[in-house]
């Protein structure tokens, strides 16, 4: 969120999410999966510090989302995207990239974690559909869907590549 805010200031653009969108993203990315993992029996001790854990999982995703914001800001005029259309793409891209991060955190996947992920995804889609007007999103046309898929693929590639680099670095530079 801080990186997106700084990016928006530097690019002289409005923040791409309204409070209600942030509430939904927070509930389905941070809230529900974190709450549900508490019910899983886990007696093993944390293997790495919170800083290293954050670098391993959150950092690649955060950079990927910021790069998607920058890419859409730069390409929106060329693609004839309105601000609302660009923000709609960013809303869905952020949600999917964040759920992908939850998948990585939950790995290795077991039945319980699979069910939690499926419930999280279905609930996010249903709530987004039910509250579509409140989310102030642009209608998803076939062209907008194509741009969304391209942005999402870009974000997934960036996130995956950065994740591999960060994991390699953390694995070759053990904790002190």
Report each predicted region and the residues it spans.
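Interfacial helix-loop-helix linkers and transmembrane-helix boundary segments
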Residues: 110-114, 137-138
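Short, Lys/Arg-enriched, Gly/Pro-containing loop segments at transmembrane-helix junctions
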Residues: 46-50, 114, 168-176
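Transmembrane alpha-helices
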Residues: 118-127, 148-156
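Membrane-interface capping segments at transmembrane-helix boundaries
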Residues: 106-107, 160-176
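Small-residue-rich transmembrane alpha-helices that serve as helix-helix interface/gating elements
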Residues: 90-94, 142-159
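Conserved N-terminal alpha-helical segment that immediately precedes and caps sugar-phosphate-binding
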Residues: 11-14, 156, 160
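Membrane-helix boundary connector in multi-pass membrane proteins
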Residues: 133-145
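Membrane-embedded transport module
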Residues: 1-112, 121-132
């Amino acid at each position: 969120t801080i990186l997106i805010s700084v990016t928006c200031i530097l690019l002289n653009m409005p923040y791409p999410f309204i409070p209600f969108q942030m509430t939904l993203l927070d509930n389905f990315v941070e809230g529900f999966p974190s709450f549900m993992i508490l019910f899983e029996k886990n007696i093993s001790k944390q293997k790495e510090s919170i800083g290293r854990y954050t670098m391993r999982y959150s950092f690649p995703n955060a950079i990927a989302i910021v790069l998607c914001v920058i890419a859409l800001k730069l390409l929106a005029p060329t693609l004839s995207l309105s601000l609302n259309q660009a923000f709609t793409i960013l809303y869905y891209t952020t949600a999917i990239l964040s759920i992908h991060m939850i998948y990585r955190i939950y790995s290795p996947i077991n039945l319980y974690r699979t069910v939690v992920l499926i419930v999280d995804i279905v609930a996010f889609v249903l709530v987004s559909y039910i509250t579509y007007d409140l989310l102030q999103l642009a209608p998803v046309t076939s062209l907008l869907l194509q741009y969304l898929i391209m942005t999402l693929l870009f974000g997934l590639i960036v996130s995956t590549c950065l994740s591999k680099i960060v994991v390699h670095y953390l694995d070759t530079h053990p904790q002190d």
